[in-house]
């Protein structure tokens, strides 16, 4: 009897293996969910460095008064004239 059974199992192995694997997988899946219990609350993702930098820059911009700007004269006088005329020939 055993040799006949082993011959049948060997011949029809693909047809026998899949249902057995399916049942074992389904039982394991449900057993794991039963043991694990409820799903934990999702953890809030931490912001990346670039996102934190953008938030910080936006907060800085919100605190500034954008109607008060430096005049163009003040900006042009920032650089010393010696630097601007360094490579130009002197006019006499």
Swiss-Prot record:
GO terms for cellular component: membrane. Coiled coil: none annotated. The chain crosses the membrane at residues 12-34. Keywords: Membrane, Transmembrane, Transmembrane helix. It is found in: Membrane. The keyword ATP-binding does not apply. It is a single-pass membrane protein. It holds the Pfam family UPF0767. Its main location: membrane. Belongs to the SMIM12 family. PANTHER family: SMALL INTEGRAL MEMBRANE PROTEIN 12 (PTHR28599:SF1). This is Small integral membrane protein 12. It comes from Bos taurus (Bovine). The lineage of its organism: Eukaryota, Metazoa, Chordata, Craniata, Vertebrata.
């Amino acid at each position: 009897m055993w040799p006949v059974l082993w011959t049948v199992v060997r011949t029809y192995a693909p047809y026998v293996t899949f249902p057995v694997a399916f049942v074992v997988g389904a039982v394991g899946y449900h057993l794991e969910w039963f043991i694990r219990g409820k799903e934990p609350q999702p953890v809030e993702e931490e912001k990346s460095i670039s996102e934190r930098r953008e938030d910080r820059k936006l907060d800085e911009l919100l605190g500034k008064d954008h109607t008060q700007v430096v005049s163009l004269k003040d900006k042009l006088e920032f650089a010393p004239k010696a630097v601007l005329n360094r490579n130009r020939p002197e006019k006499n």
